[in-house]
Amino acid sequence: SPSDYVGMYPRSEPETRALCDFTEKIQPSLTLSYHAKGNVIYRGFECVNPYPQLAEQISASTGYPAYSSSGSSGGYKDWYVTTAYKPGLTVEVGESEWSYPQIQDNMDIVLAANRQVLDICARFVQDNM
């Protein structure tokens, strides 16, 4: 479906190109993308997975499992980890069976699960980058 389309390859879509251009300008130590839904964390790929401990720390905090994907799906995180070779994570929030309005209705659950994520990322950058 169109809602699942992320592009043919990293940086193929205008909104992704704009975000990539901004990222190249500011050169962050890591990227953290939030999407809905699934209650999972996607880190780099099996062959490009810099700093897997960051995903594991966030997984321990949120209770969401962390996975490496087998290859690029064309998204922002995919582009970032393969060009910067720095940590890039996508956190999918909300139960898979929830509709998008249900995610909004359950935002207190989502926020509670993700309360420590930014602190974990900041500590990680301070200690490792």
Predicted regions span which residues?
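Low-complexity, flexible helical/coil segments
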Residues: P65-S73, F124-M129
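Short glycine-rich, acidic/polar surface loops and turns
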Residues: G71-G88
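Loop/turn elements at helix/coil->beta-strand transitions in domains of secreted/extracellular proteins
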Residues: K25-T31, S61-P65, Y85-P87
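Structured segments of extracytoplasmic/periplasmic soluble domains
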Residues: F22-I26, S61, Q116-F124
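Catalytic cores of secreted/periplasmic or lumenal enzymes
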Residues: Q53-S69
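Active-site/substrate-binding loop(s) of hydrolase catalytic cores
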Residues: S1-P52, E56, T90-Q102
